[in-house]
Each structure stands twice: as structure tokens, then as C-alpha cells.
Amino acid sequence: MPANKIDALFVNFLGNSPKWYKLAILSFLVINPLIFFFINPFVAGWVLVLEFIFTLAMALKCYPLQPGGLLAIQAVAIGMTSPSQVLHEIQANLEVLLLLIFMVAGIYFMKQLLLFVFTKMITKVRSKTYLSLLFCVAAAFLSAFLDALTVIAVIIAVGIGFYSIYHKVASGKDFSSDHDHTSESHDQLNADDLESFRGFLRNLLMHAGVGTALGGVCTMVGEPQNLIIAAQAHWQFGEFFIRMSPVTIPVLLSGLLTCVVVEKLKWFTYGVQLPENVHKILSDYDAYEDTHRSDRDKVKLIIQALVGVWLVAGLALHLASVGLIGLSVIILTTAFNGITDEHSLGKAFEEALPFTALLAVFFAIVGVIIDQRLFAPVIQWALTFEGNAQLVVFFIANGVLSMVSDNVFVGTVYINEVKSALLSGQITRDQFDLLAVAINTGTNLPSVATPNGQAAFLFLLTSALAPLIRLSYGRMVIMALPYTLVLSIVGIVTIESGFLVEMTQYFYDNNIIMHHSAKELTESVVGH
């Protein structure tokens, strides 16, 4: 191939990404087969995981689907995993994919109601600390009953709405004008106000993101892995909440206290105030909307509110899978609000489909983790401990692995390994139940450290909002750090101090929960 053609190919490769980034991805593609075939497949597997994390960390340089996808395709091609294993992972996580496709699109059609509610909240509540706590508590409460991805989709829709309103007015347009809020070529924009507003939105989004983890860990419907763990242990909704409470309640209170402290002390880039000019624009927008709201608009808000009630009720009562409820939200809101042309419907799917494709690529990496047994040494090591020490080690081991891998996968692998240990007589049924608590809290809490562990964080990082407010991988890690430390330390202390064991015994003694037998677990292994 002529030199100019090669140059053109290199320029086209990964588009506008920096040259060093393109070279890094190409070098990964060269060294991976060499390590796999000539050094050690286990080492090659861990190298691939680290490379995939690198593509996520560089999400603002290049969307991770392309570089991560190339690594995943090569991994399948050289035999690190198989197409059937990738398909199995996608099948096992079909509900998550349906949730992304339909629920996020459904939330798009409810954004008028969301903007109405949250605009009132932001314009009326002037204390940033109280507002942050409000976002954190609201996200925690919702995530106890809804999936964290759904809650984050709501928060992202609200964030984009606020940003576009400010950007439109600051660019010299009125509220009713069409405007491209992703453009940065408007001279009228006040750089200081814009930067402060970005910081303000970053703060609220991170508080809400951590809130989803704080609430999601408490109930069996809060996170997908909670459902898997509850199914393996044969726990119902109430028993799950009670068994988790010795760890989750102290952690929840500590997390909310952390929210207040970082805001008050302005640590880790928190404490950014809403600029007065931006507050005025949002207040003016609120007044403008109230004045110009027609009967049709009011009916639209009522319809969206009624659909919102159905959404919460349907998810809390598990009337259908999350994705199907999302599809019903799309149908109900569009049918009764008169959105019937294909182009208008298509816009709703733009946000979630790239991330859905990225998640499918992520499942290929999970396939490598399974086929190369990358976590096996850690699990076997953890099982060598006994009693309370074993609970602490499982919490820490789950936490560390959940920072680099999907917490649904980590939780599923661990609960199945512990179930095998119970059935082979290595542990008692009571110890199994305590380990299930350690696994659930270990996968949910420390995983806020990076976007890798929490699908909701990864969705936020790769959303259309992240580049607008300059929310990068590194920034997310730094902003999550105080929460990571507090949630992890409090979680470890509640287990290591014996508080979990003592409270569980108290629940047994007072017949709040009952002892289970190993015979209940003779059914086939769920998940992987």
C-alpha cells in the first residue's frame, strides 16, 4: 500500500483521537496475542482487562466502543474466550440490555415532567449542601426500588435539560428557540459562569450516583446481583433487607454524612455554588414555562406523572421485567401525548444505544475473565480463612474485584463458589448466609471507586452529558474517593467488629428471621 494511503488509513483510524492514543491501541493489538501464545494465557487475560479499563479511562479522547471492541474481537479470534460464551453473557444480562434500550428512551419522553420538578427544586432550594443531600437521598430512595441505571437516566435527562436551557439563553437565544447546546463557539457565554455551572452539575450528579449505590445495596431489587444473591439464599424482600441492615444502615448514614462534609468543606472539588446568573436564567425559565403552559402542556405533564406512578409501581412490585416496563412507558407517553412520527421516536434511542453496544463488548471481556479463570485464585484464597475473618476477606476481595469488573459478574461468581463450598461441607448454612451479606455489600459499596464496577457510573461517564460538563474518568474517581473510603471502611468495621454476627444472632433470637438449611440450596446454580 502506498505511503499516502497508509497515512490516510492511520488518520481515519479512531478518527480525531490523539496520535499517542491510536499508537497505544495498535500496540495492545500487537502484544496481546504474543502474551497469550508465548507467555501465559492468565497473564494475557489480566493485561486485556487493564487495557479495557484504559479505554474506559480515556472515554473523552475516544468513545470506548471502538478501541474496546477491537480488543474484544481479537480476544475472541485468538481463543481467549468464545462467541458462545459472549452470547451466554449477553443472554444472562438480556434484562440489563432491554433496560438500557427501552427504559432510557422511556425516560426521554418524561423529561418535561422531570424538568418541571427538578427546576422547582433547584430554583427554590438555595442551600447547596441541602440540595446535594436532597439529590443523594432521592437517588438512594429510588434505587432501593428501581434499578440504578433508571435513576441515573433520570438525573442525566435533568442535567442535559438544565445545561441546554442555560446554554441557549447565554448564547443570546430565547427559551422557545432551537439551539445546539453542544456548540462552544458562542462569544456571549460567560466562561466563569459556565465553568462554575459545570462544576455544580458534576457535584449533583456524583452525589446522586453514589446515592444509587447507597440505596441499591439495601434491597433485593436495588441491583441485579442482589436478585441473584437473594435467589441463591432463598431470601424474600423483607428478610434480605433485615439481613443486610447491620451493614447497610450504618453505611447509608455515613454516606449521607460524607455528602454534607465534602460540600461544607469543599473537598475533592465539591462545594461549587450555582452562579447567580445561572440561577436567574433557570428561575426565568421556570416563570416563562408557568406563564406559557397551555392546557395541552398541562395534560402532557399529568399523563407523564401518571405514567411515572405506573413506572414506580410496576418496578417495585415486579409486574414485568424492567425493559418491558420501559417499553410500556414509551408506548403510553407517546400515545397519549401525540408523539407519533418515527423521527421524534428515534431521538429517544440516541442516548442509550451506543452504551448498549459498549456493554455487549464488556460482556466479551467478562467472557475472558470466566474462561481464563482470572478470579479463581482470589476466591480460593478467601475460602482458606474461617469465621469472622472470612467475612472481612470476602468483603474486601469482592470490593477490589468489583472496582475492575462488573459487580453483577463478581457477585454471581462469588455466591456460586460459596454455594459450592456449602454443598461440599466446607462451611455451614449460617456462615453461608453471613457470607452472602459480605458478598452483596462488598460488590455494591467499594465498587463506587471507578466507573468499571457500577454500570450506572459507566453509563454516566459515556453519556452525552459527561463531555458537556467535563466529567472524565479520572475526575469521577477523584470525586468518588471520599465516598469509596467511607463506605468501604464503615462496611469493613461493621463486619470486622462482629456487629454483623451479633445483630444476625439477635434477629434469630427474636424470631425476626429464621435459620435456613443447606437442603434448600440443592437446586441448580443460577447465573454463570
From Swiss-Prot:
Q: Does the keyword Ion transport apply?
A: yes
Give the top-rank taxon of the lineage listed in the UniProt record for this protein: Bacteria
Supply the InterPro entries for this chain.
Na+/H+_antiporter_NhaB
Localization terms from the record: Cell inner membrane
Spans through the membrane: 11-31, 67-87, 98-118, 140-160, 240-260, 311-331, 350-370, 391-411, 449-469, 476-496
Q: Name one GO molecular function term.
A: sodium:proton antiporter activity
In the bilayer, the protein is annotated as: Multi-pass membrane protein
What UniProt keywords are attached to this protein's entry? Antiport, Cell inner membrane, Cell membrane, Ion transport, Membrane, Sodium, Sodium transport, Transmembrane, Transmembrane helix, Transport
**What GO cellular component is one of the record's annotations?**
plasma membrane
Keyword Transport in annotation: yes
Write down the chemical reaction(s) this protein catalyses: 2 Na(+)(in) + 3 H(+)(out) = 2 Na(+)(out) + 3 H(+)(in)
Q: What does this protein do?
A: Na(+)/H(+) antiporter that extrudes sodium in exchange for external protons.
The cross-references to HAMAP family, in alphabetical order and at most eight, read: NhaB
The entry sums up its family as follows: Belongs to the NhaB Na(+)/H(+) (TC 2.A.34) antiporter family.
Identify this protein by name: Na(+)/H(+) antiporter NhaB
